[in-house]
UniProtKB/Swiss-Prot annotation:
GO terms for cellular component: membrane. PANTHER family: ANCIENT UBIQUITOUS PROTEIN (PTHR15486), LIPID DROPLET-REGULATING VLDL ASSEMBLY FACTOR AUP1 (PTHR15486:SF96). InterPro entries: HAD-like_sf, HAD_RAM2/GPAT1-8, HAD_sf, Plipid/glycerol_acylTrfase. One of its GO terms (molecular function) is phosphatase activity. It is an enzyme of class 2 (transferase). The gene is RAM2. It catalyses: sn-glycerol 3-phosphate + an acyl-CoA = a 1-acyl-sn-glycero-3-phosphate + CoA. Pathway: Lipid metabolism; glycerolipid metabolism. Involved in the production of cutin monomers. Esterifies acyl-group from acyl-ACP to the sn-2 position of glycerol-3-phosphate, a step in cutin biosynthesis. Required for colonization of the root by mycorrhizal fungi, and appropriate hyphopodia and arbuscule formation. Cutin monomers act as plant signals that promote colonization by arbuscular mycorrhizal fungi. This signaling function has been recruited by pathogenic oomycetes to facilitate appressoria formation and their own invasion. It comes from Medicago truncatula (Barrel medic). Its EC number is 2.3.1.15. It is found in: Membrane. A motif (HXXXXD motif) lies at residues 332-337. Keywords: Acyltransferase, Membrane, Transferase, Transmembrane, Transmembrane helix. This is Glycerol-3-phosphate acyltransferase RAM2.
Length: 526
């Protein structure tokens, strides 16, 4: 018999077997009836949308890829294609609807760019939508498999790194010369019987212990498991908190603050033509006006600056009195931290940075000095700047969006005893003003494109003399103490993570870039 006929016959027999089993198991108990005790040696197979995740739609996650890789125009194309996808999905073919979403969001994109977004951006949004009952069962099993219609390249980093999945069976997208074509590899979109076929091919005669799904089309693969449970649609279910995940999400990237639902995606597209000119106006006000007027200008333009604590008065320094300026030790949220510090003080405070883009240097209203990464050179430069007046530094070396403080570099503590900790925190409703993967020159524009961004600057008490290096404390003791004080003020958690940890997690490098000849290596800051 011809091999193709044998393969066709095998597929037909498998489909018949699946149909018979599905008819015999047309109803499954709900997931809350599944015990999670004694499952350490069991294998679980779970669907993703509507099962592991509360939301049943994958629209927001494809929208994130469209925006983060292709920009606002690609998001617009994707949004225009979504009604077609919805009609196909609900009235003609589930797989055809998903195919349209894949094509509209990924066609022509580099696979490496899609993988980068999947690793650095999507986990934050996926983790905020985790179903508590499904996670209770899924996390209790020793071997975890996810079977999903979503492209594997899109979901695998989150499932394996943050949920501890051992195996991810997803739709495979086709590519040409490293770029996604928008088409799907065989056997196609994994829905209905195709899920069951892939599961049967992967596990063979071995039956997984638990199958978890949320819709009728999941019944074929659930019927191949020893136990099957349905996850009912309950939109008001409380999501799993981050502390219950095997690995907390400390670092994440991407420009969007909120999950881009269809309505939110439309608002983003409509707002950007308004928000960008508004951002330019706000930046111009901060750059061109005297610093003592910037606070009022920001307020008039919708940027709120909240000042807490008592700012120290300016220190009169000169070559004769040898008095050092105050060194402001700031927690690092965006590259705008020193600018909002200056706004709160009403005077320009120079800042040392690990590297900012040339555009950011041009539009900055304050003096910025780059660190060289050579300890002796940087120490001499900071001492010189302190002799000229007050100075700001962010010893974390890079930004962190979550309520954590990274390790403080101890160099600053060796250079002066005039230390004032400053707790910085900001609130944005639409765009993040930081990036690890994109061009940092756009960071201030994205921050000021938010409709009403907020910056809160809290001045803490000046460090007592007995807690400085001048009184016998080591620089590491001083740095760790200031980190704890700032973290306590913000209700943040101290960590020992560094800039290198962040960039390895988000960008796949250690955060350093090679500068042009005759220039020292600079660190990608912020």
């Amino acid at each position: 018999m011809h091999p193709c006929l044998v393969e066709t016959e095998s597929v037909s027999l498998l489909q018949e077997e699946i149909t018979i089993i599905t008819m015999a198991s047309s109803t499954f108990p709900t997931v809350n009836k599944c015990t999670s005790i004694g499952r350490e040696k069991h294998t679980v197979v779970a669907d993703m949308d509507g099962t592991l995740l509360i939301g049943r739609s994958s629209f927001p996650y494809f929208a994130l890829i469209a925006f983060e890789v292709g920009g606002v125009l690609r998001l617009l194309i994707y949004l225009l294609a979504s009604p077609i996808a919805a009609i196909l999905y609900y009235f003609i073919s589930e797989s055809a609807g998903i195919q349209v979403l894949v094509f509209a969001s990924m066609a022509g994109m580099k696979l490496s760019s899609i993988e980068s977004v999947a690793r650095a951006v999507l986990p934050k949004f996926y983790s905020s939508d985790l179903h508590p009952e499904t996670w209770r069962v899924f996390s209790s099993c020793g071997k975890r498999c996810v079977l999903t219609a979503n492209p594997r390249i899109m979901v695998e980093p989150f499932l394996k790194e943050f949920l501890g999945a051992d195996m991810v069976l997803g739709t495979e997208i086709a590519s040409y010369k490293g770029r996604a074509t928008g088409l799907i590899c065989k056997p196609g979109i994994l829905v209905g019987d195709k899920k069951a076929q892939v599961l049967k091919k992967t596990f063979g005669d071995e039956k997984p212990d638990i199958g978890l799904g949320d819709r009728v089309t999941d019944a074929p693969f659930m019927a191949l498991c020893k136990e099957g449970y349905i996850v009912p649609a309950k939109p008001k279910v409380t999501t799993v908190t981050s502390d219950k995940l095997p690995k907390p999400i400390i670092f994440h990237d991407g420009r969007l603050v909120q999950k881009p639902t269809p309505l939110m995606a439309l608002l983003i597209i409509l707002w950007i033509p308004i928000g960008f000119p508004l951002a330019c106006l706000r930046i111009a006000a901060g750059s061109l006006l005297p610093m003592k007027f910037v606070y009022c200008a920001f307020k008039a333009l919708g940027v709120r600056v909240i000042v807490k604590g008592t700012p120290p008065p300016p220190v009169e320094t000169s070559k004769t009195n040898h008095q050092s300026g105050v060194l402001f030790i700031c927690s690092h949220r965006t590259l705008l931290d020193p600018i909002f510090l200056s706004t709160a003080l009403g005077r320009a405070i120079p800042a040392v940075t690990y590297s900012v883009s040339r555009l950011s240097e041009i539009i900055s209203p304050i003096k910025t000095v780059r660190l060289s990464r050579d300890r002796a050179t940087d120490a001499a430069m900071i001492k010189k700047l302190l002799q000229e007046g007050d100075l700001a530094i962010c010893p974390e070396g890079t930004t962190c969006r979550e309520p954590f403080l990274l390790r403080f570099s101890a160099l600053f503590a060796e250079l002066t005893d005039e230390l004032v900790p400053v707790a910085m925190v900001n609130r944005m409703s639409m765009f993040h003003g930081t990036t690890a993967r994109g061009w940092k020159g756009m960071d201030p524009f994205y921050f000021f494109m938010n409709p009403s961004p907020v910056y809160e600057v809290t001045f803490l008490n000046k460090l007592p003399k007995e807690l400085t290096c001048g009184s016998g404390k080591t620089s590491h003791e001083v740095a760790n103490y200031i980190q704890r004080v700032v973290a306590s003020t913000l209700s943040y958690e101290c960590t020992s993570f560094t800039r290198r940890d962040k960039y390895r997690a988000l960008a796949g490098n250690d955060g350093t870039v090679v500068e042009k000849t005759n220039k020292a290596n600079k660190v990608m800051g912020c």
